[in-house]
């Protein structure tokens, strides 16, 4: 973070690490994590409650946070269905984070969603955060910066961009994230916009696919571990 402050200057706008933000007196910016809707969903007692769980998370969050902490993370159970069924008040939030799937398609869908609800995308913030490198950042900025405010959650390839420098990918970065495995004895599930990121027991993944109308995970046949 210190290196980013010194190297990027005003282009470095904050960190999602609240401890570092407090110690360095910089902006805490980002989203709540996938764990929250995963836990709320695991605690749901019916399919109806399950379908509403991701929005209940944000309703509770709305009561406690504002400004740059009101960033929607829509992909826990598929962005398309999330936006289709989202309450209108959610469009008033500061922005949206794109963390899986095709970032360009997701950005276009976010802009379209805001416009459909009477919001001006030029007053909104899109945060791209899925395995970015410099070339992707430049390309996304060039394509979308005239339509919406763009920012980039740059982590994995920021601290380790040594790809193809050792045989067998021994220096390549790897993804290390924390996910809730269960809540009150019930397994948690994450679907994502990327089928490779799906986690949870197969039986529960099938149920969540049905409830959230996600069709991309039909070929999953083995239990997956949280990641």
Each language-model region and where it sits:
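Buried, small/hydrophobic-residue-enriched core segments of structured protein domains
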Residues: 1-109, 114, 144, 182-186
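Structural preference for beta-strand elements that scaffold enzyme active sites
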Residues: 27-29, 69-71, 94-97, 123-127, ...
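Glycine-rich beta-to-alpha transition loops that act as phosphate-gripper elements at the mouths
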Residues: 76, 126-134, 154-157
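Short helix-capping segments at alpha-helix termini
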Residues: 116-121, 146-148
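Catalytic cores of alpha/beta
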Residues: 132-146
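Glycine-rich phosphate-binding active-site loops on the catalytic face of alpha/beta enzymes
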Residues: 147-163
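C-terminal helical cap(s) of enzyme catalytic domains, especially alpha/beta-barrels
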Residues: 161-195, 201
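Single conserved hydrophobic/aromatic residue that forms the stacking wall/gate
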Residues: 218-227
């Amino acid at each position: 973070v210190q290196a980013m402050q010194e190297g990027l200057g005003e282009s470095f706008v904050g960190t999602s690490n609240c401890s570092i933000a407090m110690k360095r007196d910089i902006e805490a910016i980002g989203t709540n994590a996938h764990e929250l809707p995963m836990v709320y969903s695991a605690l749901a007692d019916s399919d109806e409650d399950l379908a509403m769980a991701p929005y209940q998370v944000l309703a509770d969050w709305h009561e406690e946070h504002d400004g740059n902490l009101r960033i929607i993370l829509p992909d826990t159970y598929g962005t398309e269905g999330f936006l289709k069924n989202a309450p209108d008040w959610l469009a008033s939030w500061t922005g949206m984070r794109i963390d899986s799937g095709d970032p360009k398609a997701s950005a276009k869908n976010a802009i379209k969603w805001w416009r459909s609800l009477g919001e001006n995308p030029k007053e909104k913030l899109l945060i791209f955060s899925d395995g970015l490198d410099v070339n992707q950042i430049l390309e996304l900025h060039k394509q979308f910066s005239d339509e919406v405010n763009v920012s980039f959650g740059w982590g994995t390839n920021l601290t380790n961009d040594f790809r193809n420098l050792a045989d067998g990918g021994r220096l390549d970065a790897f993804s290390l994230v924390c996910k809730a495995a269960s809540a009150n004895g019930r397994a948690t599930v994450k679907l994502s916009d990327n089928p490779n990121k799906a986690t949870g027991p197969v039986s529960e993944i099938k149920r969540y696919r049905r409830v959230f109308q996600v069709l991309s995970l039909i070929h999953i046949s083995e239990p997956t571990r949280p990641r």
